[in-house]
Each structure stands twice: as C-alpha cells, then as structure tokens.
Amino acid sequence: MASKTTFKDLQEIPDFPKEEENILKFWDEINAFKQQLEKTKDCPPFTFYDGPPFATGLPHYGNLLAGTIKDVVCRYASQNGKYVERRFGWDCHGLPVEYEIDKKLGITNRQEVLKMGVDKYNAECRSIVMRYAQEWRSIVNRFGRWVDFDNDYKTLDLKFMESVWWVFKQMFDKGLVYRGCKVMPYSNGCATVLSNFETQQNYKEVDDPSLFIAFKTAEDPKTKFIAWTTTPWTLPSNLALVINKDFDYVKVLDAKTQEHYILAECRLPELYKKDKDGYKILEKFKGSELVGREYEPLFPYFLSRKQDGCFRILAGDFVTADAGTGIVHCAPGFGDDDYKVSVANNIIKPDDPPVPVDENGHFTNVVSDFAGVYIKEADKLIRKNLKERGLLLVDSSFKHNYPFCWRSDTPLIYKAVHCWFIKVTALKDDLLANNKKAYWVPKFAQEGRFNNWLQNVSDWCFSRSRFWGNPIPIWVSEDFEEVVCIGSVEELKKLTGATEITDLHKDFIDHLTIPSQKGKGVLRRIDEVFDCWFESGSMPYGQQHYPFSMNEEEFSKRFPADFIGEGIDQTRGWFYTLNVISTALRNSNPYKNLIVNGIVLAADGKKMSKSKKNYDDPLLIASKYSVDAIRLYMINSPLVRAEEMSFKSEGVFAVKKDIFLPWYNAYKFLIQSITRWELATGKDYMFNEQLSVDTTKLTNPTDRWIIISCQNLINYVRIEMEKYHLYNVVPRLIHFLENLTNWYIRLNRNRLKGDYGLEEQETSLNVLFNVILNSTILMSPLVPFITESFYQNLRKVIPKGSSYLEESIHFLRIPTPKQELLDEKIERNFERMQNIINFARTLREKRKVSLKQPIMSLTVINQDQEFHDSLKDYIQYIEDEINTPSILHEINTANYVDLKAIPNHKLLGQKLGKEYNKDLKAAAGNLSAKDIETLKTTGSIDLVGKKLLLEDFTITQNYKKEYSSGDLELGGEGEVILLLNLAQDEKLKSKGLVREFTSNVQKTKKKTGLKVDDNIVIYYDVTKAPKLNAAIQSDLEAVQKVLKKPLVPLSEKNAALKIVENSLLTFQVDEESVTIEIAYA
C-alpha cells in the first residue's frame, strides 16, 4: 500500500480571494503574460485596439466590465493559437484634465490662465495626467486582465502627437477641413465648444422657464405678437420673430387688457388656459401674410441692426404647433435654427451673429442692464423687467431633458462660435457603407443606434479653445487667406527654421512662425487644440507612430483591428471617431469585430455616483467573493447584450455559492478519489486521456454521456466564440458544470470511491479527470484565477509529452472537439432521463411522499417507441433516483390523457380565405386522438384536401382524473408523461426505514467532520425501534455496504475506543426512537 500520495488535502471551504492573490504571485514569478506573448510570437496576429481611459480618476465597474470582456476575448484568441498584442493606452489631454486643474487653482476664465502662463498651466496639467496610473495598473492586474502597461501609449507623447498631426494633414489635404461660424453646444463651465456627440453623454431632466412674451407691432403698440421662449437670457439678443407660413393665425381682442394679440389659432387654448372665454377673434389669416411685418425690439442693445432688416417677421419650418404660440423668438447667436433662418433672410452675415455672452456665460457690456451677470441668473431679472413693462403674459415652467457638460456637469448652451470642422457630411455614404462591413455584437447596436447616428451626422467641430491638448497644426495669416497645415516634426522644423523640437504642446511651439509665401508677413499657429476625441480616434496610428516608425506593410498587418470592445455610450464617442478618421484616410472600417456592453448601474437602478456612495468598492467585493466571481457575474448578465444592469453584491455571492463551490467540490472529490485509488493500489495515478475517450471501451452509459457532452461543449464554445457570443457561451459552460456536479458525480460517487472495483474506479477517474480538465480550460479565459488554481494541482498527474501539460493553464490551447465523439443524440437521451427524474420528484413532492420512501412503480407514457428505447441504458439510474423497484412503459397515451386540438379560426381564415369553408372548419374542430398525435409528430395534417399546420391549432391535454387519486398520481411536462404508483408493501416500507436510518448516520458523519478514509465503528441502539431493527436485520449486508463501516449494537460498545466528538445522536424513524454513536476504530 502506498503511504505517500500525489496530492495534499484540500481546504474543506476554499478561500477564493486568498488563492487569487497566490495566483497573482505565481504569474509574476513565471512572468506569465510575457511568456504567453513569447510562446505565440510566431502565430498569426490577432489585432486588438484598447480604448484609452483617463488616469485622472480610478477605474469603475464600467471600466472593469469592458476590461473583462476584452480580456476574455484576447485570452481566448491567444489560447486559440493567435499572437495578441495588448497595449494599454491613456487619454492624457482635454477637459477632464483641465477641469481638475481649474478646480485646484480656482481658475474661472481664460484670462487667468494667460496671466498665469500657459507653460505653467500645462505643467500643472501634466503633473496630474497619470495621477492614478499606478492604481489603474494595480486594479486591472488584480482583476486578472493581462495587458501591457510597460509598452503603453500616451496621447501626450511626442510620437503619438506627431502621428495625430499626420492623420490630420491627410484629412486637410483631402479638403475635409474648414473654418466656419456655427451655433454649437458650448460649455460655460469649461469655456469651450463641444462636439455634437459629446452633448449626448449627459442629459438630465430639468425645469426650464416657458414664457409668452408680447412684442409690440411697429404700426400699433396696442397690437402685439405673442412669442414663446424657454431661454429668457437670449431675449436681449433677439433680432426677429419666426412663424410657420402654413399655419392659421388669429388677431384677438383680450377681454382684460383690451389689447390685440396675434398668435397661431391652434395655440389659443394655451394662452387662455384659465379663461377660455377671455378673448374674441377679430381676424384670421395665413402665416404667410405676417411675413415682413415689423415690431419694436424688447431691448435697445442691437437697435442699430434694424437697418439690416432685423426686427421683422420671418418664416421657418421649425416652428411647430405642439408647443408655444406658433411664434418663436429668434436670437441667431444662440440657436442653430435661429442662425440659419437669419442668414437665409440676410438679416445677419454668416460670420457676424450677435453674441453678447463671454466664454464663461456672463453678459458682456453690450447688454448694459445685465452686464457681468451669469445668463441663467439673468433669467429672473429679465422676467422681472418684462413683467414690470407689461410684456410678460405667461410665466410658467416645463420639464424636459437637457444636455449638460459631460465634464463640468453644468448646463450647455448653444452659441455661435468660429471653429474648425471636419466635413463628416461629405463622408456620410462611406461611413454607412463601412459600418455594414463590421460585425457587431449585439447587432441592434450597429443597425439601430449607430446606424441612426450616422444617418444624421453633422460636421465635426474638432477645435477646442483650451490649452492642454495637441495643438492643431495650422498656421495662418492674419486674414486667414494663407493657410499652411503641418504633418510632422520635420516639416515643422523645415518651415519654421527650428533646430530642435522635443515637445509639441502649445507652450513649446506657439512662438514658432512660418514666413508667408504671399507677402503677408509671418503665419502664426491658430490658438485652438484638438478635441481629445480626435486623438483617441487616431490611436491605431498614434500607438505605432505611423507612418514614421512603422511602414505601410507592417501597419496593414495591424489594421483594421480584429476586435475592439467598449460600452454602448461609445457609439457616439470612440466607435464614431475611429470610423470617421478611418473612413477619411482609408475608406475602411477600423475594426472587424466589436462587442458593445451595457451600462452598469448601482443596486438601486440609478447611475453609480461617488458622491452618493451608492455602490461598493470593487476591491471590497473582490476581497469578499473573488475577482472571478465578479467577472462571471458581469459576463453572464444582460450587460454583454448591451443592456443595463444593476450591480448587486448578492449576485456576486450567488456565483460563488451556486457555481464556484459546487465546481470546487467536484474538483476536490476528484483529488480525493485519486488519493483513494493510490492508497488502494500502491501506484501513482497518471491521467490516461486515451482510456477516457475510447467510447468503445466505456461500458458505463454515464461515462459515455459526460465525455460526449464535454466534446459537444467544446464544439459549441468554439462556434459561439467565433461569433463573439459570450452571452451564449457562459450559460452553456455553467450548465455543463451543473450537469457534472449534480448528475455525473452524484450518479457515480460510489464507482469513483472504488466500491465497484479498481478497474471501474480507474475508468471513472479518467473520465472525470478528462471532463474537469477540458471544462477548466474552456473556462480559463472567463475566470483565470480559479482555473489556474485547479490546473496547477491537476498538472501533477498529467504525463510528460501530453498536449495538456504546460507551466500555466493560460499557455494551453483551447481544446478542439473530437469529431467522432460529437453526438447530440446521447445528450438528448440523457436529458430525457433527467426530465423523468426531475418531474417524478415534483409529483412526489406534490403528494408529500419523501424520496427516502420507496414507491411501487413509475410508468413512463409516450406514444413513440423510440422514446422508450432511448431510456434503456438509464433504467437503473431512474429506479435509484426515484426510489422504486419498477419502471414500466406505456405507448398508448390515449388511456391516460385526453388530447384536444382547438383550431385558430381567425388565423386559418386569413390564410385560406373562402377555402376555409364549413366542412373544413368542422373537420378541424373534431380531430381524433390519432389525428392529434399525427399533427404533433409531423407538424401537419391533411383535412378535406387541405394541409393544416401545427401552428394553426392550440393543443391541450387533460390528464384523466382516475389516475390522480388514491395511490396514483399522473402528470406531464413537455414530452414526459408519468404515472406514479405510490403504494408500499411491507418490503418497500422496510427499505424506506433503512434508507432513513442510513441517511441520518451519513449526516452525522459529515457533521462531525469525519473523512471518508477514517477508520470508525458505528454503534446503534434500536431497542425502542423494533420495526427498524427488523428492517436492518433483514438486509444487514446492504446496510453495511451503504455505510462502508462496521455497524455494531451499542450494547457491544468497546469502552477502549475513543468516541468521535458530538457523534452521539438520538433521532426518530417512523416514530421510533434510535440512538447512534461513532468511535474511532
């Protein structure tokens, strides 16, 4: 007998988080990630682009979710024979950084930055760019993601910035860049314009004013146009009123004021909500008749513009009948529609709308009455002013969704600004075509959300009036007539005469000038910097320093990406900018495959908020339940279908309890069984793969089933991972683990322990080892820690030279299915057995008959003989699991079930029209049991010369009541119909008593912490239980076989033996008192 075994004892209750820490140390010791890259360097490349986060804040659950999905896909690709470079990236410029510095230094406007010095300001920004980089690295590593931080890219690096310049010059040279004045979303909080897609990121429900303002007509001060506005602060900039020329308008006499009001007829009820009879209609006319009529301006600030045609009625299609008065106040400096209609009517020049609001949202001196006042605070002052002058007729408010700055969280305004644009509208058709070439998961995000966004693209305002960013490389003359775009550091040196350039930020290059080629003196760089989204969209080029450090041949091997993945919000962010730049430069989609994940919400269903503290720290949850549990919880959720989900720690705990612990127990049981085999044989166990998969030699049907099931699983995982369907892969893997633990091991526990001989034990051990090993490998990209932990132990018994032997599980290849073992029929047959067992238990529970109590028989009812034949290998298992000595078969379902087919007359009428006549209706409504069986089996039936389908009927089955009374219970579920005979004779009752007795003994052994191999004696006292005593004595050998330990009357107790602590127990069996006590032998 061997005294030394291969494996050490495993923990009864594992500490998964602690084991993860051990695995992290192991990976560091063997340099696992770099080893994986080295081992696959000659494999075909699998290109992955990582979207760059800002390091000015800590990673949140959204980052960890996206990172987990990326890690799963990249690990799988690497284990599938691909070389997967995974470079981390950092967004280093833009509003997130500047906003932090402005808060830190108390900066409120541009002049304060200039006074401080751009160089000092940018130095402050640079100092915090990587503030949390080490924490990011630590947390990302802790969450099991293998990604290269040492070879990361940063958008502030000179090489990256130079590639961005090159990208931009390509677009400039193609005529896709222009400067213009447009009304754009503007952040007063950050003092800069935002792009249209940035405005989509932070909408909030707010209360805003809804005012009806009276504008005096020029010809009669007592006649007034009633206009609507929701932005009182724009009224000082009013230059026109806009109507819809097709609407019907009215002139009414107001009963209270005796003044005349003009507004759309359909909006009268809105003005006279409180006094329905408070007016009299004097005139009706079309809106077109109002065009050109003049009115008196509310404020005098732009009175001089009257000579340009201002302060008159214009027509515009954007005026609607569902709100307001049918007359809209027009301030062309603060509304896109206002601007366009004003330019179209020549009341302003395209580059000269009035904008009397400074960069931080305060009125300039032009608006003398409110100079220096913040616009939203001016609302109430303007309302008061108008009310005192009798011009405010309705002062109310309304709720609506309004965009806020994604960085400063202040309400945006729309403001006319001079900006630089990319002609995305010129790329629209190509963008739409390229979008169709990519493969998105889920599809709706591509075909719906993203396609809709592309259908409505506007030109991209990529310039920002900020400081910490990549400077736009355009040098211009004072009149903007001469424009030079720079595409490289060398070109900048050549044109400016600079000898050394070590940094491209504003403070390093803004002093450089270029001599004019047209006699205009010198050209100076424009003031603006790039929108940081332009930089992240340029990352395929920037991270490689293309085309300076990498040629086209090498770059084309890495473009487009094989895979990217981010949250659904990036459909209007990174996914979009990647596409715009890629389409502009190469007319190509920048990625082949994309997984879009949903948004992680707090447990209360609201957005996660640091200030509200409505979510737990990810590291805290990891320390409680494990990183693997968090990973599996998130990727087995609606999140991988791009849907929202509330993150609940209870869900993570459920993964640990319901998946990891049973899986661990299966693994532990395998280790214990191998140890038992080694002790029994005196040999060292070594996994024999060939023995485990040779189904011609596997005589046990459950062995064949679990091996074939595992091969089908391998095949399924490969197919679905090729489609990037994580939402299909994870549930199937979990289902397999459940089958492994709840069925295979439970049905074969005694074989695996050696109760059926060493040969059977070795066979079952090899089978169990095979499926645990293969399923662990399949799970390894998803849950890298627990799988590594299992594998490091299992590899001790994998023979040298085996394809399963590597230093780490993550160096192994994903298994390929053995085609000869792919057999869905075997799985289907086993599933039928499972369904019978599960439903029979349900029927027993319904009648409150304990599973410990044997029943007379179980009849399986199905009209198909093939169904019964498919169960022949599993009859013994059904008998054991249902606790019955007899399984009967019945094919005549009509004896037990009344079937009825109810035709869908409406559907059939629509399909057949007049052909669905009286005779056919009668035939359809009177199908025989045989007809219904034919319909169910074949899916159709011929009636009166017409073929009707199963979908044309509703099939009902009613179980005959005579089989659900007394000792009988009849029921059905799916294709399973069962009849239980719950009667018991004396022999069955006796077996039931024994089973209850042995069950209590086994529970006591487990409760006292005894191990299977402990030498013990079980003492029992049944002097007060004559029925149980008789039952035990009648089948003592079988009882001892179940207990596997000597069973001795308590009266013969050996006083010299040590009693097992807490093993003395008295319990009831069929109202008889029994006592047991256990001693060490």
From Swiss-Prot:
GO molecular function list: aminoacyl-tRNA deacylase activity; ATP binding; isoleucine-tRNA ligase activity; tRNA binding
Catalysed transformations (reactions): tRNA(Ile) + L-isoleucine + ATP = L-isoleucyl-tRNA(Ile) + AMP + diphosphate
The enzyme's E.C. designation: 6.1.1.5
Entry's Gene Ontology BP terms: isoleucyl-tRNA aminoacylation
Keyword Nucleotide-binding found: yes
Intervals of motif 'KMSKS' region: 607-611
Motif 'HIGH' region in this chain: 53-63
Disulfides per UniProt: none
Gene3D superfamilies: HUPs, Isoleucyl-tRNA Synthetase, Domain 1
Highest taxon of the lineage: Eukaryota
SUPFAM superfamilies named among the record's database cross-references: Anticodon-binding domain of a subclass of class I aminoacyl-tRNA synthetases, Nucleotidylyl transferase, ValRS/IleRS/LeuRS editing domain
Keyword terms: Aminoacyl-tRNA synthetase, ATP-binding, Ligase, Nucleotide-binding, Protein biosynthesis
Entry binding sites for ATP: K610
Similarity field: Belongs to the class-I aminoacyl-tRNA synthetase family.
Name of the featured protein: Isoleucine--tRNA ligase
